[in-house]
């Protein structure tokens, strides 16, 4: 078996199973695929080979994952229900739910947004190749939100240029741990890839420019949780998650960047499920061929509504 890369991760936070930790730290791989790699002897903890996916990890331990070269993927249409908000001959706008991976990768050969798009939408751009037809931008697996899809290569190139030149408009609703003091603020700090954990990012002066604006919508003082409206001016990977973690306010549910399950009531934790409390609810862009400004918004998914309702009901 040929190895394409070797990744190292440092365990932070609460005790967790090895397979669950790696599936969260390396979201491109499904948990079942991670289990397979562990059993094949491709995972080491503190320098020792571990073949037991249920092995409990503790804070400070180091995990090394040997990633095998990917096999060619056969991406097929699948009748996965998705909400298509808008569609014309050039674009489609869809609502991606929490838990749905955007495109196939090793361990995620089916059950992705791309599989759903191939079934529901006749034509998709080919610039992204077999694995990413129509995909112009991404949302994390644990994040719900609105996405624009390109149906031809002309639209694809135009939309990619808009994202690169920051001509799009992106707003999020976010629940973070802790009481954010200022009603309005901006986080203007560069973001770089973590030198050890290559799937994570952190604030570093030598990183790429990243600007995040935020407005406080409500503070739930009893539980030390803040609801924010957030606008990102740059599109760095994990930008909102990294920026708020850097000021001591991790996104609820985001254990990769410092959220601790013990910091919220168990009842609230169960309502959150596997989702990060982060919604890409607003997307604005220029139509790639007509040039008109278009804005699309979605309502909060049921998971988020349940969390909001619980906080409202249990707050004084």
Swiss-Prot record:
The set of disulfide-linked cysteines is: none
- Would the keyword Acetylation turn up in this protein's UniProt record? no
Q: Name one Pfam family in it.
A: S4
The UniProt catalytic activity note for this protein reads: a uridine in RNA = a pseudouridine in RNA
Single GO BP term:
enzyme-directed rRNA pseudouridine synthesis
S4 RNA-binding domain location is: 16-89
Q: Where is the active site?
A: 140
Molecular function terms from GO: pseudouridine synthase activity; RNA binding; rRNA pseudouridine synthase activity
Keywords attached to this Swiss-Prot or TrEMBL record, sorted alphabetically, are: Isomerase, RNA-binding
Q: Which class of enzymes does this protein belong to?
A: isomerase
Q: Which InterPro entries match?
A: PsdUridine_synth_cat_dom_sf, PsdUridine_synth_RluA-like_CS, PsdUridine_synth_RluC/D, PsdUridine_synth_RsuA/RluA, RluA_PseudoU_synthase, S4_RNA-bd, S4_RNA-bd_sf
Q: Which NCBIfam families match?
A: rluA_subfam
Q: Which family does it belong to?
A: Belongs to the pseudouridine synthase RluA family.
What is the protein name stated in its UniProt record?
Uncharacterized RNA pseudouridine synthase aq_1758
Source species of the chain: Aquifex aeolicus (strain VF5)
